[in-house]
A protein has these predicted regions:
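A general structural signal for short secondary-structure junctions and capping/turn motifs
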Residues: 21, 31-32, 44, 90, ...
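Conserved short loop/turn motifs at secondary-structure junctions
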Residues: 109-113, 145-153, 168, 200-201
Length: 214
């Protein structure tokens, strides 16, 4: 581990606190980025399975599933890696021990893990480029693919489709999930925990690409 103390700085990050963590069995370094205010936590505990995670506070204001769609969309190509499905390519070629992205009621996280150092650095670079320079900003078709669009069935009747739409349609067909979401709605009527962060199929089509970009 690099020798960092509470006066150290590296790559624009300044150290705020260094402490031992019994729960994590190692040293924890808490830092902040001077220009952006981004917070960084670095844990050194001798674990050979290296883990990186970039996380964002994402507080929904409705049940359109905007952050769930965003989670999917940023992993559909970026400035440095303009392939259609970099996530799938990584799954096929990487030695990753964990590779995923998850949307919660109040945050979205993009974690990767690998025991191979070069593979770990590659995964980290791909994920950072995905979240900070995604192709979705220039290509609305990614939104329609991952969020929602309209197709015609064999009789010419319109049908809603989309990766997230279909996923949440399946999830919300479960009675337990419906009861759970209704319970949250009653318990938290005035904050983010009352909304369906994954997206309610009844409301996902309310989201436009223009609203998504905001």
């Amino acid at each position: 581990m690099m020798n960092l103390n509470e006066t150290a700085a590296r790559h624009g990050f300044c150290v705020d606190r260094v402490r031992e963590s019994e729960n994590l069995h190692g040293k924890m370094v808490e830092m902040h980025h001077e220009k952006t205010g981004a917070q960084l936590v670095w844990v050194d505990n001798g674990e050979d399975n290296k883990t990186f995670c970039v996380a964002f506070k994402t507080l929904p204001e409705d049940s359109t599933g905007v952050f769930h769609i965003l989670e999917h969309s940023v992993l559909c190509g970026s400035a440095k890696y303009p392939v259609r499905e970099p996530f799938v390519e990584l799954m096929k070629s990487s030695m990753a021990t964990f590779l995923n992205a998850m949307t919660f009621p109040d945050k979205t996280i993009y974690p990767v893990s690998s025991r191979n150092e070069q593979d770990f650095l590659n995964l980290t670079e791909v994920y950072l480029d995905a979240v900070f320079a995604p192709r979705i900003l220039q290509d609305p078709n990614i939104f329609y693919q991952e969020g929602w669009h309209i197709e015609l069935d064999e009789n010419g009747a319109p049908l809603y489709k989309g990766v997230v739409f279909n996923e949440m349609k399946g999830a919300m067909s479960d009675v337990d999930e419906q009861i759970y979401q209704k319970t949250l709605d009653v318990l938290f009527p005035d904050n983010c925990y009352g909304w369906n962060s994954g997206g309610d199929p009844k409301h996902i089509p309310d989201l436009t690409y223009e609203q998504f970009l905001r």
